[in-house]
Design a protein with these regions (language model features):
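Short, charged/polar, Gly/Pro-enriched secondary-structure boundary elements
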Residues: 123-129
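Zn2+-dependent peptidoglycan hydrolase active-site motif and core
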Residues: 57-92, 114-117
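Short histidine-centered loop motifs in beta-beta connectors
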Residues: 56, 80-106, 134-136
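Surface-exposed, glycine-biased beta-strand/turn segments
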Residues: 5-73, 102-103, 129-170
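Conserved beta-strand positions that form and line the central face of beta-propeller blades
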Residues: 46, 76, 86, 109, ...
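Active-site loop architecture of trypsin-fold serine endopeptidases
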Residues: 110-123
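Glycine-/small-residue-rich active-site loops that bind phosphorylated ligands and cofactors
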Residues: 52, 92-93, 123
Length: 170
């Protein structure tokens, strides 16, 4: 029997993981909401991971920014549902501003640390949110189910393509 995580979140948005298991990622700094727009906090999650790891688009969207801010390389993807996915401390981007990307598509290469942030945009109001709210990684967002045949469970599709289909709604 295969063990699979199935989303049970009330939200229709489940983002694709920005890296795969070969990255050996470890959280080094959790999301901490700032008290005000310019107040201290951590507006995303920071990971330690294997340098040169592939980074993947968390959702369908369009690359809205790719470049340096200060001495840090960033990539931002504007999703189809008014979210901005930020990849920071990347080594390089493999996509350019204006490129359409699909959930699960390789978009960048990591350094040995990586920042992942999510902003929700409502008109002129921008709000940083905890990426864990959308990543299908915690027990609060998923339950484990036992199935005899993984392919039958996914209708003949792989687990990865099923997760990607969920990310298309973000």
């Amino acid at each position: 029997m295969a063990m699979l995580a199935v989303s049970t979140s009330s939200s229709r948005c489940v983002l694709h993981q920005p890296f795969d298991s070969t990255a050996n990622a470890t959280v080094i700094d959790e999301f901490r909401a700032p008290a005000c727009e310019r107040c201290a906090g951590n507006r995303g999650i920071e990971f330690s991971l294997r340098q040169g790891s592939s980074l993947f688009s968390a959702s369908d969207g369009v690359v809205s920014f790719s470049g340096r801010v200060g001495q840090v390389e960033y990539l931002v993807i504007a999703t189809n549902f008014n979210r901005r996915i930020t990849y920071g401390r990347i080594e390089s981007s493999v996509v350019r501003v204006g490129d359409r990307v699909r959930a699960g598509q390789r978009v960048a290469v990591s350094t040995n640390s990586f920042y992942f942030g999510v902003r929700e945009v409502d008109g002129a109001q921008v709000r940083y949110v905890d990426p864990n709210r959308y990543l299908d990684t915690s027990a609060t967002f998923a339950k484990t189910v036992l199935v005899r045949d993984e392919n039958a469970f996914h209708g003949g599709r792989s687990e990865r393509s099923s997760r990607t289909a969920l990310a298309n709604a973000c």
